[in-house]
Amino acid sequence: MASTADGDMGETLEQMRGLWPGVEDLSLNKLATSLGASEQALRLIFSIFLGYPLALFYRHYLFYKDSYLIHLFHTFTGLSIAYFNFGHQFYHSLLCVVLQFLILRLMGRTVTAVITTLCFQMAYLLAGYYYTATGDYDIKWTMPHCVLTLKLIGLCIDYYDGGKDGNSLTSEQQKYAIRGVPSLLEVAGFSYFYGAFLVGPQFSMNHYMKLVRGQLTDIPGKMPNSTIPALKRLSLGLVYLVGYTLLSPHITDDYLLTEDYDNRPFWFRCMYMLIWGKFVLYKYVTCWLVTEGVCILSGLGFNGFDENGTVRWDACANMKVWLFETTPRFNGTIASFNINTNAWVARYIFKRLKFLGNKELSQGLSLLFLALWHGLHSGYLICFQMEFLIVIVEKQVSSLIRDSPALSSLASITALQPFYYLVQQTIHWLFMGYSMTAFCLFTWDKWLKVYRSIYFLGHVFFLSLLFILPYIHKAMVPRKEKLKKRE
């Protein structure tokens, strides 16, 4: 689902619709006022797009240069961006980076270091949420800090894995395990990389070090041929930005809280939530596509070659746009949206809970971690609780259709496929919007008001299916199919 700084990015793009008129005064404050945006929003937008000239500078002047120069460049530019956006509050990130380095050096590759890192970094982030919380989305230092928190926790776990015997690690853990001892400059460069400091994406220390060593290129010994792929992602991001800018005055979060919405027919309330639920995610899509382009341009997006020898630039992709736009399933949206954050949680939380012996419990705890990572508001918990419920029910429905001969035959009728797709998409985006209502409104008085207006439809629908589906499965799946499945 949506990523950390999601709300803050949303607030930024919400205010982008006024960015087109020209102004004469170049003062940021006056410029922002003229555009109908906040100064913080303007600073954030400028900082995200600043990644492109910085990536060009790196390509032409620092590629294959001494590693310490590259680390210094990333550290200086990242700290400058932090100061430009948050002033003296940039010290929060710097403090956590330095303390994390000390934890690695003083505690070494131990479980104690991992537990200390997890507790300290999450506690610092949650304390930041608590002391800066308001009833609305604000662009403040906690926005990039939640991205940094995952980076530093992942860094410590990979460092811990680097001290283990290779045979005791999975192939994935071997890929990310850090065998050497990172210096303070390396940790700082990794943390402050300009293309991902503010809004992500997540990437590992090993991948970052490949960038520094000049290994992330499709032409060994030369700069990566990544300008066109980067411009394609930038262009796609701008398409989403223009669409969002034009439509945002007409499809707003605030309308869900109005009396006019309450007084509309039930079908209208549901249809508005469906359309809004799809549209509200475009602000996140925009930011991630733009920052992905920065990562590709620098080379960080290089992901080797496919089986046909075609170069892949999706190492930092946070979106699978085609899948996101066409999938009729909730799992499809999860697989296509905020990819690197979801992969991080799967790698460092979900799979590490394997010892519990219960996949659903591990998944539930992973989603609880994600909810807390997003913030302390109740809406985040409700949103991820709905995701957990929906995914479980969707798996049960898929299993029922697959195992039932009657339903399987009905589902395979070609002439009915367009109808099935339309029904699936309607259910999919209606209840995606239902879940996003709590996420975007986030305080209990707001999301509760909207849920009451549609009679808690999402909870009633999926909780009913959760209890009814086992009986339907028992009635419609022949005994021999059940025995075959067990075998």
UniProtKB/Swiss-Prot annotation:
Positions where N-acetylalanine occurs in the chain: 2
Main location: endoplasmic reticulum
Keywords on record: Acetylation, Acyltransferase, Endoplasmic reticulum, Glycoprotein, Lipid biosynthesis, Lipid metabolism, Membrane, Phospholipid biosynthesis, Phospholipid metabolism, Transferase, Transmembrane, Transmembrane helix
Ranges annotated as spanning the membrane: 44-64, 84-104, 111-131, 180-200, 236-256, 285-305, 364-384, 422-442, 453-473
Name of the protein: Lysophospholipid acyltransferase 5
GO annotation, cellular component aspect: endoplasmic reticulum membrane
Enzyme class: transferase
Keyword Acetylation listed: yes
Organism of provenance: Mus musculus
Superkingdom to which the source organism belongs: Eukaryota
Recorded phenotype for the gene knockout or disruption: Mutant mice are born at the expected Mendelian frequency, but none survives beyond day 2 due to an extensive triacylglycerol accumulation in enterocytes associated with very low blood glucose levels at birth (P1.5). Conditional knockdown in intestine results in hyperproliferation of the intestinal crypt and increased susceptibility to intestinal tumorigenesis.
Outcome of mutating residue 374 to A: Loss of O-acyltransferase activity
EC number: 2.3.1.-, 2.3.1.23, 2.3.1.n7, 2.3.1.n6
Short sequence motif Di-lysine motif: positions: 484-487
Active-site residues, as the UniProt record annotates them: 338, 374
Catalytic activity: a 1-acyl-sn-glycero-3-phosphocholine + an acyl-CoA = a 1,2-diacyl-sn-glycero-3-phosphocholine + CoA; a 1-acyl-sn-glycero-3-phosphoethanolamine + an acyl-CoA = a 1,2-diacyl-sn-glycero-3-phosphoethanolamine + CoA; a 1-acyl-sn-glycero-3-phospho-L-serine + an acyl-CoA = a 1,2-diacyl-sn-glycero-3-phospho-L-serine + CoA; (9Z,12Z)-octadecadienoyl-CoA + a 1-acyl-sn-glycero-3-phosphocholine = 1-acyl-2-(9Z,12Z)-octadecadienoyl-sn-glycero-3-phosphocholine + CoA
Topology in membrane: Multi-pass membrane protein
UniProt-annotated glycosylation sites, renumbered to this chain: 225, 308, 331
Free-text tissue specificity from the UniProt record: Detected ubiquitously, with high expression levels in small intestine, brown adipose tissue, liver, kidney and testis. Expressed in liver and both proximal and distal small intestine (at protein level). Expressed in peritoneal macrophages.
A biological-process GO annotation: very-low-density lipoprotein particle assembly
Compartments it resides in: Endoplasmic reticulum membrane
Function in brief: Lysophospholipid O-acyltransferase (LPLAT) that catalyzes the reacylation step of the phospholipid remodeling process also known as the Lands cycle. Catalyzes transfer of the fatty acyl chain from fatty acyl-CoA to 1-acyl lysophospholipid to form various classes of phospholipids. Converts 1-acyl lysophosphatidylcholine (LPC) into phosphatidylcholine (PC) (LPCAT activity), 1-acyl lysophosphatidylserine (LPS) into phosphatidylserine (PS) (LPSAT activity) and 1-acyl lysophosphatidylethanolamine (LPE) into phosphatidylethanolamine (PE) (LPEAT activity).
InterPro entries according to UniProt: LPLAT_7/PORCN-like, MBOAT_fam
Domain remarks in the Swiss-Prot or TrEMBL record: The di-lysine motif confers endoplasmic reticulum localization.
Pfam hit, one: MBOAT
